[in-house]
A protein has these predicted regions:
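Sec/Tat signal peptide C-region and signal peptidase I cleavage site
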Residues: 21-27
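Bacterial N-terminal signal peptides that target proteins for export
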Residues: 2-13
């Protein structure tokens, strides 16, 4: 998929996503939202779905999912409120229960305040997330790829026609190689058994956004990085000739809006 196609697809998905928001997935919550007078949108800055910049008293908020949720709030006759989140706390802000992915399973932790009504920022549907969240109909395709600098000796694989076989090939290539990853997100190395490949998995110090992964390898923090489809296409346009896609690390994935499990 080219960058132009990606952008056209984003626009086309807006209409579909709008219908997702009005689905029966959270019918009972709608009355509560109307009574409260505000729709609370939990979002993590990511690709063209949510862009959030806070500089003192000035906030800049844009993105596909932002416009969709704002439009839905308007249709309900309520105000729109953005609730900033990180990958590690977005589930808790929605469900009121801290949940982390650990040892290949969802681990439920302490109770936390509920701060929002839905999560919309191109959330990847993962098995562990489906255990604690309900998802709308998917509205955008995704997947995780291995991306490296062009000066890396890693070479893009030749597609075999089978995603599973391509994933195996890529995993064989990264034995002993540096791979940047990001826990609690769709780039969590534990989701793809990356430690079993013999790769030198590098995790960032402190918080990092998905769109900071490529700049990190450009600064030689690692030779390569895991990167989802949406951010990869944006990065290829932003750094033409400086990065290359080696191949897939995951099966095909899908994105959707997330709701609380107790929403019918």
């Amino acid at each position: 998929m080219s960058v132009k196609t990606f952008k056209r697809t984003l626009a086309a998905m807006a209409l579909m996503a709008a219908s997702v928001m009005s689905s029966s997935a959270w019918a009972d919550d709608l009355q509560q939202i109307r009574d409260r007078g505000v729709l609370r949108h939990i979002g993590v800055p990511y690709a063209n779905f949510v862009s959030y910049i806070e500089q003192g008293e000035v906030e800049t908020l844009t993105g596909l999912d932002v416009e969709i949720v704002k439009g839905f709030a308007k249709s309900l006759g309520v105000k729109y409120q953005y609730v900033p989140a990180q990958w590690s706390d977005m589930v808790g802000k929605l469900t009121g229960q801290d949940v982390q992915y650990h040892n290949k399973q969802a681990v439920v932790g302490e109770s936390v305040p509920i701060e929002g009504d839905l999560i919309a920022n191109g959330v990847t549907i993962l098995d562990w997330r489906s255990e604690v969240l309900d998802f709308s109909q998917d509205y955008f395709p995704s997947g995780v790829w291995l991306v490296s600098r062009t000066d890396s000796t890693l070479s893009p694989i030749k597609p075999s026609g089978s995603v599973d076989e391509d994933v195996k090939t890529v995993k064989q290539l990264i034995h002993g190689r540096e791979v940047l990853a990001l826990e609690h997100s769709c780039l969590d190395p534990n989701l793809y058994d990356l430690y079993d490949t013999g790769a030198k998995v590098i995790l960032p110090d402190g918080a990092r956004l998905l769109n900071e992964m490529v700049p990190a390898i450009m600064k030689n923090d690692a030779e390569s990085t895991l990167l989802d489809v949406a951010d990869t296409l944006i990065a290829l346009e932003k750094w033409p000739g400086e990065i290359k896609v080696i191949g897939p690390v995951s099966e095909n994935q899908k994105m959707a809006v997330a709701f609380r499990k107790n929403s019918p």
